[in-house]
Amino acid sequence: MAHAAQVGLQDATSPIMEELIIFHDHALMIIFLICFLVLYALFLTLTTKLTNTSISDAQEMETVWTILPAIILVLIALPSLRILYMTDEVNDPSFTIKSIGHQWYWTYEYTDYGGLIFNSYMLPPLFLEPGDLRLLDVDNRLVLPVEAPVRMMITSQDVLHSWAVPTLGLKTDAIPGRLNQTTFTATRPGVYYGQCSEICGANHSFMPIVLELIPLKIFEMGPVFTL
């Protein structure tokens, strides 16, 4: 999860997030190289005493600054497209969970367990226990297993929402009248937090998402729900 004064990304808890962190570092390295090259060229331009007013064209230079950006764009686009296709893959999920966005809470349905449905509201400050996180903890957590592919079916009952859990690399829009899906495989047990990531009204900031990921063997003994 996130820490106080954290600058970087959260630790990855899924293969997709691991790929996103690698791609982030890859793109950041390219950006640093471009910035260094531009600043170096600017420094040379400002400090040089040489002048040349007889040059009317520079085909070699124009060729370089046309081909080089194209190569850089390809180096960014290829891994980006690879991750994009990975996020769209749905490979025989073990569990299917339906998530419905409301103003301003989430409803979850375990479709594989008799259609168990419950609502998940943010805990008001008066109900927080020692160790709970303000504006992030909920009354009913979504309990899921690790090391098992999970499919999330996401929609909305009223306005646009977005179901997002950064540590899993997930962000899927919840659109009224449309059912979007995403899959993930968690690699570590723990409690992970997210929030609605689409401005959805006055209390947009108060509809957190909490996932409690437990070992698959414990989950298979019987669903453990914090109701």
Curated annotation (Swiss-Prot):
Q: Tell me what this protein is called.
A: Cytochrome c oxidase subunit 2
Q: Which residues cross the membrane?
A: 15-45, 60-87
UniProt subcellular location:
Mitochondrion inner membrane
A single BP term in Gene Ontology: ATP synthesis coupled electron transport
Give the quaternary structure. Answer: Component of the cytochrome c oxidase (complex IV, CIV), a multisubunit enzyme composed of 14 subunits. The complex is composed of a catalytic core of 3 subunits MT-CO1, MT-CO2 and MT-CO3, encoded in the mitochondrial DNA, and 11 supernumerary subunits COX4I, COX5A, COX5B, COX6A, COX6B, COX6C, COX7A, COX7B, COX7C, COX8 and NDUFA4, which are encoded in the nuclear genome.
What is the protein's known function?
A: Component of the cytochrome c oxidase, the last enzyme in the mitochondrial electron transport chain which drives oxidative phosphorylation. The respiratory chain contains 3 multisubunit complexes succinate dehydrogenase (complex II, CII), ubiquinol-cytochrome c oxidoreductase (cytochrome b-c1 complex, complex III, CIII) and cytochrome c oxidase (complex IV, CIV), that cooperate to transfer electrons derived from NADH and succinate to molecular oxygen, creating an electrochemical gradient over the inner membrane that drives transmembrane transport and the ATP synthase.
All ranges on the Mitochondrial matrix side of the membrane: 46-59
| Membrane-side (Mitochondrial intermembrane) residue stretches | 1-14, 88-227
Q: Which cofactor does it need?
A: Cu cation
This entry's comment on the bound cofactor is:
Binds a dinuclear copper A center per subunit.
Q: What keywords are assigned to this protein?
A: Copper, Electron transport, Magnesium, Membrane, Metal-binding, Mitochondrion, Mitochondrion inner membrane, Respiratory chain, Translocase, Transmembrane, Transmembrane helix, Transport
Q: How does it sit in the membrane?
A: Multi-pass membrane protein
Question: Has UniProt tagged this entry with the keyword Electron transport?
Answer: yes
Name the SUPFAM superfamilies on file.
Cupredoxins, Cytochrome c oxidase subunit II-like, transmembrane region
EC number(s)? 7.1.1.9
Query: What is the gene name?
Result: MT-CO2
User: Its family?
Assistant: Belongs to the cytochrome c oxidase subunit 2 family.
Binding positions (Mg(2+)):
E198
